[in-house]
Amino acid sequence: MANELQKIEREVHRDVEEIEEKIQTSETFLLSAILALSGGFQDAYTYNVRDNVFSNAQTGNVVLMSQHMMLGEWGKALHYLFPVVAFALGVLVAEQIGHKYKMAKRVHWRQIIVAIEFVILFVVGFIPSGYNMIATMLVSFACSMQVQAFRKMHGYGYASTMCIGNLRSGTESLSVYLRDKKPEALKKVAHYYGIILTFAVGAGIGGVCSIYIGLKAIWGSSALLILACMMMVQEKR
């Protein structure tokens, strides 16, 4: 009986190793970290130089929108509503692209998403401050496409442009590890908190760059997306 259990355990371990080897570049920690850096950069950018509106943290926008609505400040409420709508539209478009090009052989559909996101953010760098609402909507649209396209890291769900879900999942995994001492749970903790850390670093860099460089600072996020796209192109080859 003991020998049979050991045999089953070895087979399961081998299967896990094979699955890890087959993980796509889009689900690796390195690419996820690059996307998180870019996501943090975007949020800091729109908050600092685009009228204190969040491009990624739509919960904050909903809170501020609701507050202004209750105060009868409808113009200010719309200021926060439009990025939320743009975020929803981005998810819709990304889902359609994923469905249409999921089986494409020449290019991975996630590469298409990253390429579109890069173009949008590059254009945003040219939009003057008088059109901040349009700029923020475009960043929110691009961000949500990224959120929709990149939802897994080493097989488990995560978010590259926000922290609350990662914080919950990481802390849950920490609790499991403290109770059961499972190495896989500790690995999840490292991945989730690592993504939170890289998001924070990206936000810090984005904040400093937006303060000193201004509107064109968003090109730093575009550069990170180029790197992400190159990694996926290399895998495709």
Give names to the regions the model predicted.
Residues A2-R237:
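Alpha-helical transmembrane segments of multi-pass membrane proteins
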